[in-house]
Amino acid sequence: MQDGRIKIYKKPKPAHKMKFTFPEGTTAVMGHTRLTTQGNQKFNFNNHPFYGKADKEFAFAHNGVLYNDKALRKEKHLPKTHIETDSYVAVQLIEKQGKLNFESLKNMAEDVQGNFTFTILDQYNTLCFVKGSSPMFLIYFEQLGLFAYASTESIMSKAMKKSGLNGYRYSRILLSEGDILSIDRNGKTELSAFETFSFQNDFRYPDGYDSHEELLLEMCGCFGVPEDDIIQLLDYGYTADDIEEMLMDSEMLEETISDIKEMNEYEDLWEYGEKIH
């Protein structure tokens, strides 16, 4: 926020290389590290957060993948855009309604199909969460009057250690799929809901994978990585966060997969040796 207007700073580079300072008087900040699935990240307009404007300005970020963005553009007669990502259709659905409120967020969430958790920050420093099947970890530091969120608990834990927040007590705010939560600049919270789309729950991978792991299995093809490789990593105890980092570092991913395959080959040879003896 600067002079009552939303200001978005983003670059097509790793988050740890980003350097910026907060404007004086800042009370709310949202950030996003993109795992690219659609739209070249080298073109900065494809990166999150996105700028939107309805009855107020807002910044919008999405964790997940939408499957019906092209169909919605035709069905809802949305304007043409140079932005290539599936996520941006959600911004356009809000803008088309002309308002940013619980009703417009509900309508948008019920129109899109896929995996998502959306975060929206408006020009009055109200932050909204629209919780779909994608993971989210939200906490509140009462002593500091501070809300903080990340996609997973492990990512939050790392951020807290680096920022020094791990020295403070906090409580977790649990949101279920279908919840919409708003937090205004004074910390007042309001809760609403939307109807979840049954397609999100029609298909499940075997062996009880959670929603974050299923999302990685669905997205891995965008990186040219076979599902079998992701399943092997999960079977060997790598977490969804570990695998997400590997997808953004192809050398690390290839090396890890190669090591696992070598171990499997060694185990097969050992079992064969046992049998012939």
Which stretches of residues belong to each language-model region?
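Conserved short alpha-helical segments that host acidic/polar catalytic motifs at enzyme active sites
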Residues: 1-277
